[in-house]
């Protein structure tokens, strides 16, 4: 069975209706027998909104905390995508970066990443988000 990585940017997951549309595209690939890994961005405009909240909170913010706040948008979208796929009877779960794990350099806001291999459980054929 082939592996397919599908990436959805902020505009394509901008709201719940668009997440459902993206999930239908994932479902089509699953129906064709593919193992799918889904990567999602934050919903359109959410990263800027989160960054504005940081700026409203602190004039001289810590880059580590800025990254923690701003990256939460992707986590929300991943959870919503997993829930949408589950509603379609497709086994799915979201993963946070630390669960994969995704390792980074310590250069906050401009870190380089190193991604470990993700294990997809063959018996469940779970969609990984």
Regions found by a protein language model. Give the residues of each.
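Nucleotide/pyrophosphate-binding catalytic subdomain
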Residues: 1-125
